[in-house]
C-alpha cells in the first residue's frame, strides 16, 4: 500500500460573476452614491460628481471591492495608453515624412502632422526640408522607431493596428476582471507572488525580449542604415530570424550559434554585446550594441530577483520577515507593522510607488540628454529640450501625488491604536523637530541663495564687477560637483579597462561628438553660475518638501486642530466660530505644494535650456570650431537676476513674440492664450466666495424676471472648488506658456 501525503488544496482566488453588468446603472450619473444619484438640486452637484466618481473609498468601505475597482480601472488606463500609442504610430504611417527623415536625419526635420487649409491656417505647415511641409514634431518618436528597426510606413501601420487590438483587449480585461472573474482580496495581498511575477515577468522577460529584438532586428538594420544603405534595400525583420547567415555577415559570432554560450566562451559574443561607453560618432546616440548588452544584463538580474520570494514552495524570502528584521539602535520596533499597512492601505502603497516613480522620472530626464539613447536624438535640440521639460514636469507631479496619497493614508487608513513605537509612530512623535529644522533649512537656503544674486545685482548696478561672485572675480566654484565629474571621467580606466569612453561625455575628458555639423554632446563645464542656481534648486526643493511633509505629518492632528482626522482629507476651515483655521487640511497642503513644485521645476528647465544653448548646443565648422547658440553667455549673464530677465527670458522670447505670420505663429497664439489662462487662475485664487454668491443672486433675479430661470439653483464655487480650479489653470497656463516659449525659440535657432 502506497501512502501519499494529502494533495495541497488549490486555492480559488477569484469570485465568478460578482457584479452584474448593467447599462442602466452606467447611464445613471452618480450611481455610486445615494446622495448624488438623486440628481441635481444645485450646481454643486456636478462638482461632487467629479470629485467622488473615482474616490472608490467613498463608494464603499469593503477593501476587496475597492481593490477590484482599482484593478479594473488599471486595465482602462492601459487601454487608453494603447489607444494613444496607436494614434502616434498611425500619424507616423499616414501623415509623416518618416521615410524621408530616415534617409537623411541630419538635414530633414521630423513631422507627423499636416494642417488642412480651412481658414488659411496652412501657414503652420513649415518647410522641414526634403520637399515636405508640416508641423515639426519634438516627441522623439522618429528616433525611437529608427532605433527599434522600423524602416517603412507599412510597419508603422501594422504596429498601429496591433496597438488598437491590445487597447480592445485591455478594455475587455477591465470588464472581465470586475464583472466575470474578480480576484479575491487574498490575491491582491499576496505580495510575494506579485513580486515574483512583476520582477521575473514584466522586468525580466520584458527586458530579455527587448534585448532579443535589439540583437536580431535593431542591430542589423541600424548597421545597414548607418552604412548608408537605402531603407528599401535592407532585409525585413523576419529575414534575420529565419536566415542566420544574414546576421553572421554583420556579426561573425552568429555563425557559431549557441556553442560559445554553452561552452562558457562568452567573449565570442563581444561583436554584438559591447561595453564601449560614449556615443556612436555616426548617430550621436549610445552604441546600440551597448544598449542590447545592458538589457540582457538587466534581464538576468531581474529573472534572478523574480525567484527570491517565498510562495507555494516554502523557500525564499517572506516580505513580512524582511521588514520586521529591520531594527536599528534608535528605531524602537523598527518596521514592525509596515507590512500590514502596505497590504491594507493602497494609499500608503501608492504613495511609496509615486515617490519612487517620480524620482525615477526625473533621473530619466537627466539621462536623456547626458546619455542620449536613440540615434540622431542628441542633435535634435527641440526634442532634447521637450523630453527634458516633459520628464521634469511629470516627475514633479508624481512626487506631489506621493504626498497627497500619504496624507490620505494618514487620514483614512492609519490606526493609531495598533501603531506603537514603530518607525512611523516615532516619526510622528518628533514631527515638530523635523518640521522646524526643515523650516530653518529653507530659510537659510532662501536667504543665502537669493542673497548671492542680490549681491551680484547690486554690485553690477554700482559698476563694480570686480566685487561680484563670478568666474572672473570672486569665484565660488562647485568643487564637489567638479570632483564627481572628474572621477567619472577617469573611472573607466580603473573599473572598465575595455571601455573606450566614460558613461557620459558630459563628465569631461573626452572630445565632443558632432553629427552633421551640429554638436551632439561635449564635456559640460560647471562654474560659479551653476553654483548659484544649484542653491536656488536646493531652496525650492526644500520648500516643496516642507509644505508636503507638514501636510502628511499633521494630517490627523495639530496643536491648532487636535481633531483634524475627524474633519477628513479636505475641509475649508474648522467651523465658523474658530477663526484662523482655514487652509489647514491635508488637501490644502497639496494645493500649496503644487505651486512650489511649479517654482522648482521652472527654475530647473530654465537652467537646462539656457545652459545647453550657451555651453553645449551649436554648430561645428570644418576646422572644428564650435559656435554655441548663445555664445557661452550663461557663465557671466545668469549670475544676476537682471541677467536672467534680460538675457534669458526677454532675449529668448523674441522668437515666440515675433512668430506671427510665420509657420510658428501657433506658438505665438499659445503663448498669448496660455498667459490668459494663467491670469484667469488668479480670479479664482484671490476670490471671495460671498462676492460671487451675491452676484449670482442678482443674475438669478434677472432670469426669474424673464421667466428663464433653471430648475437647478446656481451656487458659487466652494472655497475648495475655487482653489482647485485656480491651481489647475495656474499650472496649465504656466506650463503651456513655457512650452510655447521653448519650442518657438529652439525650432528657430536649433
UniProtKB/Swiss-Prot annotation:
Pfam families: PsaA_PsaB. It catalyses: reduced [plastocyanin] + hnu + oxidized [2Fe-2S]-[ferredoxin] = oxidized [plastocyanin] + reduced [2Fe-2S]-[ferredoxin]. It comes from the Eukaryota. Phylloquinone binds at residue 692. One of its GO terms (molecular function) is magnesium ion binding. It is a multi-pass membrane protein. P700 is a chlorophyll a/chlorophyll a' dimer, A0 is one or more chlorophyll a, A1 is one or both phylloquinones and FX is a shared 4Fe-4S iron-sulfur center. The chain crosses the membrane at residues 70-93, 156-179, 195-219, 291-309, 346-369, 385-411, 433-455, 531-549, 589-610, 664-686, 724-744. Keywords: 4Fe-4S, Chlorophyll, Chloroplast, Chromophore, Electron transport, Iron, Iron-sulfur, Magnesium, Membrane, Metal-binding, Oxidoreductase, Photosynthesis, Photosystem I, Plastid, Thylakoid, Transmembrane, Transmembrane helix, Transport. Its EC number is 1.97.1.12. [4Fe-4S] cluster binds at residues 573, 582. It is an enzyme of class 1 (oxidoreductase). Gene3D superfamilies: Photosystem I PsaA/PsaB (1.20.1130.10). It is found in: Plastid, Chloroplast thylakoid membrane. Chlorophyll a binds at residues 683, 691. InterPro entries: PSI_PsaA (IPR006243), PSI_PsaA/B (IPR001280), PSI_PsaA/B_CS (IPR020586), PSI_PsaA/B_sf (IPR036408). Its main location: plastid. The keyword 4Fe-4S applies. GO terms for biological process: photosynthesis. Chlorophyll a' binds at residue 675. Belongs to the PsaA/PsaB family. The PsaA/B heterodimer binds the P700 chlorophyll special pair and subsequent electron acceptors. PSI consists of a core antenna complex that captures photons, and an electron transfer chain that converts photonic excitation into a charge separation. The eukaryotic PSI reaction center is composed of at least 11 subunits. PsaA and PsaB bind P700, the primary electron donor of photosystem I (PSI), as well as the electron acceptors A0, A1 and FX. PSI is a plastocyanin-ferredoxin oxidoreductase, converting photonic excitation into a charge separation, which transfers an electron from the donor P700 chlorophyll pair to the spectroscopically characterized acceptors A0, A1, FX, FA and FB in turn. Oxidized P700 is reduced on the lumenal side of the thylakoid membrane by plastocyanin. This is Photosystem I P700 chlorophyll a apoprotein A1. It comes from Atropa belladonna.
